[in-house]
């Protein structure tokens, strides 16, 4: 067994929601264990008992009871969950507004890039949702209709989602940094009736006008009957939008109605709630439909139990409305916590911007990406020395595997006594397969545990479950947050092909990972980016972990290039400004990789590039780079934040020999 880098103290364990849930499950159900391993095993062996316990422990509000919890967990896709139950997602998230102890509590705090701050209580949030619900009714929004948002991460975005869901309508959002083609490829598939849009946004100290894009979206997507424009950047009043008959400004629309009691539309457990999108780097984005009940109970499980979120907590996650972590974040309202929203660049005007917010708001749970932690470490920034982080209890990291060095950085330069939970799942399940745990120690490079109720295993090439070795991450039992399906996917053909074409009745997630003897999980990268030199499978994250040790490298991307009837590893690196790749640095990189992995991991070629292509949510795109290197078309570049970067990889002389 390895030595942990952090362990929870007995008091923290005893006071945790996870511990309280174990007591609850022992008293009310047939669970008899006293540790996480036994609880996890019970959740897999008795899924009906576990998910019913979760429903009751989290006090989900429903107008009709369920007839049964699940009909058959071996049926994937197609398992029925909580059949007969009727509920409303927004009603559950706004429930603190009906509690005298929490209705005046701050629900949301918003920070803009310029430092402007706004806050809203649960009662005022309820009132604004009530007003917008009345607006949407006048706009003829009904159960099942789609409302699309082209919005920054603001209070208005949360109000828009809650009002939409209160009516039983379906919410879908993109961040305003999406190009017009990227927005069209997404929203035109789902035919929204209403568009909620911003007149602009701020990033890296610049104000970016979106008025022309909003007008073009409204013109091109003919299903849009009404447009609500949020005057976020101050450009609306002098724009062409003010003269459009189907367009109204947000404040103007809400001011026409007084807050009244919301009639929450009661819908079945499996009723569509969100439409999220795949990255779209291999074609038109897939429209992934997530359910009301599945999203709610899964997020409550992850917030209450795995994150140990409580009413007195303040939760922050750096995200945009175009990333599933936004959907995950806003579900924290159901717990009664205070959520902190931020829109802008995470390191503008300096690397301290998010940590200043953490100090000012006394944030207890701070969520970010692995890439961000690596970036501020390379900047030499030490939040623990600059900021008072005494309230900080948990740091969450996702988006890509968190390197061993980033674990060291957090405990050395941010805070010694903090639960650093690397989490992994995806848009596909709007949640996590592996994540944090208040009961368990932290080991460098590992996610603490598999999520309760998630039958996660690693399969070898023969489809056999393996421990302590690398394999395909799969889920062998149905789970509530499995998508309803893809939008407009006749007979679920694309949905089945995406997740169930590799194994029968087994979800293949597309991650390459490992289950450890400590009970944790290691993610080695995406399966479609796995390198295969000489027939040996290597996850790209194994290489990135070593490259991050070389301080002059800001970012890297590795691919496999077909070469002489085999595959060879190619590593591209972006260096600090003013530096150049020479033989000494190449030798240092290769030596670092060889000494910490195997000779097979050592790249055949290391090439300097000025930029690394990435998605709008910050994920590097190995598949797109591999396609360009091999002269294959990249079908959809509108999902990339910097599509022009792909040109650096085309027809490289270095790869011709």
Where are these regions (language model features)?
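Conserved AMP-binding/adenylate-forming core of the ANL superfamily
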Residues: 38-42, 90-91, 108-162, 179-184, ...
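Adenylate-forming
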Residues: 152, 194-213, 234, 343-347, ...
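Conserved pre-ATP/AMP-binding loop-to-beta segment of ANL
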Residues: 104-106, 229, 242-277, 284, ...
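AMP-binding/adenylate-forming catalytic domain of the ANL superfamily
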Residues: 226-231, 595-620, 632-656
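Structural core segment of the AMP-binding/adenylate-forming
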Residues: 166-252, 361-362, 369-370
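Conserved AMP-binding/adenylate-forming
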Residues: 305, 393-520, 527-530, 543
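Conserved AMP-binding/adenylation subdomain of ANL enzymes
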Residues: 294-314, 324-364, 379
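AMP-binding/adenylate-forming catalytic core of the ANL superfamily
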Residues: 149, 174-199, 214, 347, ...
């Amino acid at each position: 067994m390895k030595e942990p880098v952090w362990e929870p103290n007995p008091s923290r364990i005893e006071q945790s929601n996870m511990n309280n849930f174990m007591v609850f499950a022992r008293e009310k159900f047939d669970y008899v264990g006293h540790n996480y391993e036994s609880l996890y095993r019970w959740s897999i062996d008795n899924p009906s008992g576990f998910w019913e316990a979760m429903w009751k422990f989290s006090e989900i509000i429903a107008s009709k009871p369920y007839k049964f919890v699940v009909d058959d967990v071996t049926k994937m896709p197609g398992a029925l969950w909580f059949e007969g139950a009727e509920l409303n997602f927004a009603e559950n998230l706004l429930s603190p507004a009906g509690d005298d102890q929490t209705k005046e509590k701050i629900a949301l705090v918003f920070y803009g890039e310029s430092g402007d701050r706004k806050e809203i209580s649960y009662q005022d949030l309820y009132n604004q949702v009530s007003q917008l619900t009345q607006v949407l009714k006048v706009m003829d929004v009904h159960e099942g209709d789609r409302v699309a948002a082209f919005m920054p991460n603001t209070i208005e975005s949360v109000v828009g989602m809650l009002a939409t869901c209160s009516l039983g309508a379906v919410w879908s959002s993109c961040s305003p940094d999406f190009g017009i083609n990227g927005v069209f490829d997404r929203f035109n598939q789902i035919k929204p009736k209403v568009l909620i849009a911003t007149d602009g946004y701020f990033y890296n100290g610049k104000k970016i006008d979106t008025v022309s894009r909003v007008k073009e979206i409204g013109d091109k997507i003919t299903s849009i009957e009404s447009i609500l424009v949020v005057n976020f950047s101050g450009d609306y009043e002098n724009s062409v939008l003010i003269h459009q008959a189907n367009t109204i400004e947000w404040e103007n629309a809400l001011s026409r109605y007084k807050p009244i009691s919301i009639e929450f539309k009661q819908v079945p457990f499996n009723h569509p709630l969100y439409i999220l999108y795949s990255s779209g780097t291999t074609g038109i984005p897939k429209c992934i439909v997530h359910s009301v009940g599945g999203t709610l109970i899964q997020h409550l499980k992850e917030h209450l139990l795995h994150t140990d979120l409580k009413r007195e907590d303040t939760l922050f996650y750096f995200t945009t409305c175009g990333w599933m972590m936004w959907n995950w974040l806003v579900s924290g309202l159901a717990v009664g916590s205070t959520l902190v929203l931020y829109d802008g660049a995470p390191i503008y005007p300096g690397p301290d911007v998010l940590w200043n917010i953490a100090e000012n708001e006394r944030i207890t749970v701070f969520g970010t990406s692995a890439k961000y932690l690596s970036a501020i470490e390379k900047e030499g920034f030490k939040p623990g020395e600059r900021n008072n982080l005494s309230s900080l209890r948990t740091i969450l990291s996702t988006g890509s595997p968190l390197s061993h060095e980033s674990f060291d950085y957090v405990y050395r330069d941010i805070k010694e006594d903090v639960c650093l939970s690397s989490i992994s799942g995806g848009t596909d399940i709007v949640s996590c397969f592996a994540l944090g745990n208040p009961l368990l120690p932290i080991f460098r490079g590992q996610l603490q545990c598999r999520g309760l109720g998630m039958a996660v295993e690693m399969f070898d090439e023969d489809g056999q479950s393996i421990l302590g070795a690398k394999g395909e991450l799969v889920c062998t039992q149905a789970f509530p947050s499995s998508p309803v399906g893809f939008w407009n996917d006749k007979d679920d053909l694309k949905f089945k092909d995406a997740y169930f074409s590799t194994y029968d009745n087994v979800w293949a997630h597309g991650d390459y990972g490992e289950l450890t003897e400590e009970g944790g999980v290691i993610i080695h990268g995406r399966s479609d980016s796995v390198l295969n030199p000489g027939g040996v499978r290597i996850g790209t994250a194994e290489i990135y972990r070593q490259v991050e040790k070389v301080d002059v490298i800001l970012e890297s991307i590795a691919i496999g290039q077909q070469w002489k009837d085999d595959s060879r590893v190619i590593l591209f690196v972006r260096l600090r400004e003013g530096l150049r790749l020479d033989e000494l640095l190449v030798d240092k990189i290769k030596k670092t990789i060889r000494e910490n992995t195997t000779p097979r991991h050592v790249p055949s070629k290391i090439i300097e590039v000025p930029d690394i292509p990435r998605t709008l949510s910050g994920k590097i795109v190995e598949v797109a780079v591999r396609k360009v290197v091999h002269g294959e078309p990249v079908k959809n570049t509108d999902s990339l934040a910097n599509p022009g970067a792909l040109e650096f990889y085309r027809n490289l002389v270095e790869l011709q020999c």
